[in-house]
Amino acid sequence: MDNYFEYIFSKETCQQILLLEQLYNNPLGLDIDELGDKIDLERRTLRRHLSYINDVANEYVVMSKPIIFQKKKYVFTGSKSEYYALKCNILKPEPLLNLFELFLNSQSVNFIDFCKENFMSESTARRKLKKANILLQSIGMKLTIRKDEIYIIGEERIIRYSLISLFWRVYRGTEWPFENVDEGRVENIVSSIISSGRYISYGKRKHLAFYLATFISRSQSGNVISKALLPEYSSALIANNHYMGELSQLIEQSFKLPQVELEFILLIFYIFPECYEEFHSVDDTLAILKKYSRRSYSSIMNFVAFIKKRHPKWDKDSPSTPFFWPMLISGRLFVDIFKDAYFNSSGVRIFKHAGTDYPRFLPTIRKSILSHEPKLATNTLKSLTLRYGQAYIMEFSPHDFEPKIKILLLTDSAMYIEKIISQRVENLLKYRFNFILEIDRPSSTPDLILETDVIDTKYSDSKRLFINLEVAPKDRENILTACKDILKEKY
């Protein structure tokens, strides 16, 4: 369920969001037919949605007219922050968004009042709840009505993560939806944990603040986390953390929370790699996992062994980036805490993009995980695959898993010209394919030969392209097409 908005928001709202996304991602604009092809809507509906989006922008003073019509194309003229603000204001009137916001501060919501406040009939409201449950039941949650009260049923930790995921995708830091939690106080807590000596983007800090605000809101409304459902190493991890006393004091100055909530908040910082080194060394954390959760420890070390097998010269004790181990450990801790709650809070369809650009990457990692943990639930496996995949690409290219394309460059030019051509070809291909580019003397039969004026008949079965010395735009297009065709033959 890549686009879970479809289960929560109305059809028209989803169309408007998709339309806005298409225009934002195509800065040169799209004509009405191109929009129709991408969104599969007739012209009249598209124009109605475009007009509505501009009306929303005017009403909320996001900007006067974000979508203009020029040179027969519709163009979004706003900035990134204006795009997020506009998207947020399109979504805000949605009834189920309002319902989930009410659950931040309540254990139940009156069904009759909810219908009245959102101008809906009871039958319409029930249909919306039923549709949302198709999504929620996949992670053990459910919206139910008992004695005219709406309840959200499920494990508290899963409910919290689901709310965070939804609110972050809707608000993206443009607004603060937590009416009973002071934004400044939460940001002070975040700043106290994250070292002031390291730059962490506004968005990442805000995302972490959304976690804390959701936890505080739910706890204050009587929806307390169960310590019994936290990972078995939680207490040991927290007890060895020198920040516990400082954090407890800071939070208690502003919020009255049970001890288990303080511990849960501290534990959550571990799922953010940027915060990780503030707490423990890698060795300390691994030692705790090894003692209290052999399964989690083995999962991490098995994946490290998987990397080592693919890259024998790689030194796990001296990775090229300091974030490799934090990314790997935080990924496993995330899965241990939230289990099979797989929601993509970023709004990027990662598995879809990976399947297009490097189709063997995530499936290979998934297979490696399954070889050691064959009974993982589907969503848990999906989440762990993604987290370990993120750690892998901190060190190596995701194209490592794709078939290698052997390219031979043949020219009759001076060596420095030859070098310039090879660099241009490498820059064109390095983020798209797993390839080796050789000049004059190939180590084996090439898949593709790039020639300038040279005619070489030695490799008669290899695909050939004649290119200009400057590697013109048409040459680049032909090279990309040839590489894609070769990959199709290799799969």
Predicted features and spans:
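A cross-family "folded-core" feature that marks the main globular domain of proteins
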Residues: 2-491
